[in-house]
Structure formats: C-alpha cells, structure tokens
Amino acid sequence: LDKTREVIRRKCPEYLNCFDRVMKQTSGYMFNMFIVRKDLLDSYCTWLFDVLFELENKVDLTGLSEFQKRCFGRISELLFNVWLEYQLERNVVQVEQIKKFRWGYMEPIRSRKKIQAFLFAKFCGKRYRCSF
C-alpha cells in the first residue's frame, strides 16, 4: 500500500487526501462489483488501470504464493473507494445516488479459521495463505 500511495502521489496527487482517508476507514465497498453510468465507468477504469499498471512495475512478486500474487485485485477494491471518495468530494456523484444491495454469501465460511487468521495477521504479522 505504501507503493500504491507513492504512485498516486506522483501520477494523480489530487487523489492523495482521499487515499489517506480511505486507508484509515474500517469499511468500504468491496468485491469490485457495481452498476454505474458508462461515462463514470470509463473515468474509473482509466484512472484505476493507470495506477495499477504503474504499481505492477514497482511490485516484485517473486517468492509470493499464488494467494499473495492476487494483491492487485485486493488493492483495486480499496482503490474503488478512493475513486468514489474523490467523485463524492467533487460532487460528480452524490451520496443519495449510492444504493446498496444486500446479498448473501453462497459458499460456506469457516468462521473460526477466518477469525483466527485475522487475529494472527493483526497482532502477529502472520500473512493469510488462503481465502476463507
């Protein structure tokens, strides 16, 4: 995430305050799923992939597990929130326009393992090795 911040600072500094705010949040819009007008989608994709392609050149994936190599997908989930925050700040999108759909997770979740892995990651610095 430090490298992501650096890319944003260099390529699109107007987004930096939004990035910093989003990184302090404990919630957000995840899973890279949304319904949006084409012009906003084009704007988002242009910005997102410009940042991600630059970031890809700065991150060495050597020695990482297949799970860890999916970092760009996870970073893109956070970046959607940065982009959205910026659009809200500029009044391109209004809060009232954001609709949330409730959905259920269809696969079983191993809650005990998930909680245990989260605590180990949070307090012991042990990285996740798989999804739950």
Language-model regions: role of each:
Residues 1-132:
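ER/Golgi luminal nucleotide-sugar-dependent glycosyltransferases, focusing on the catalytic module
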